[in-house]
Amino acid sequence: PRNYCFHFTCMGTVKHHYAMIGTAHLEDGYPLYYDAVNEKGLGMAGLNFVGNAHYQKEEEGKENVAVFELIPWILGQCGSVEEAKKLFMRMNLTDTRFRGNLPAAQLHWMISDRNQSVTIESVQEGIRIHENPVGVLTNNPPFEEQMFQLNNYMHLSPKEPTNHFSDKLKLQAYCLGMGALGMPGDLSSQSRFIRAAFVKMNSVSGDSEEESVSQFFHILGSVDQQRGCCETKDGTFETTIYTSCCNMSRGVYYYTTYENHQITAVDLYRENLNGRCLACFPLIREEMIRRQN
């Protein structure tokens, strides 16, 4: 809510700010956001950027903001991507820990409003702002590399392919979907970026909110991580813990979890936006099955 106090490491206490809604890990009563959208319709999400993220020590004359504070710092005072870009020009992103046993997460971020998206990366050279024309971001590699790889897939099409192989051969498509032959199907973040970009930019949604929300989850379903298919070095499995989107005009936040495919909605405006206490809702993690008989 607007009057929840954010105690920033170097920037003091902010008692009044834009209200926001999102998914967070609550640590000692403080929301460590994975993603969020504010009441002005500005959204932000952080994704893994291990090995490439680089943060600075505190610097005099800059607005020093710790990584774990970044989402509320931006969404608390910015109503658009353009406002956020100006704020980043004054900012120094630090590696200050929330607590001793919680190291700074290595992330890069996508920030979006109704009109545009940008990717923010803090690297050795400093903070970099990239225009994001596809409105998609995954984990590593750096965003410029992700975008460059799209050049290798400019032949992909939702349409039925025609024969460019040779006019001496009578070649023809023998099933639907062959226009997308060659689209990577593996679970690497680079391949998921390509797949998500293609599906997002070619998908067709109905006009209603329900149809748009449904289509969003179908789009993200194309890059779902299934348990058992991506094993980490310590023997655990990478999975899609949750998937979310938000109607930026109405402040309705929708999500599913790995365990529950039913879409759950949380409405920002059904809470007291002028309150001082967090409104917390646990993620639903058991499958909700609608039985018809």
What is each model feature region?
Residues 1-63, 90-91, 95, 282-284, ...:
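A contiguous strand-loop segment
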Residues 44-46, 129, 253-255:
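Short hydrophobic/aromatic-rich beta-strand segments that constitute the beta-sheet cores
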Residues 33-35, 108, 119, 243-245:
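Short, surface-exposed charged micro-motifs
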Residues 47, 57-67, 91-144, 148-149:
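Acidic/His-rich structured neighborhood in mature extracellular/periplasmic domains
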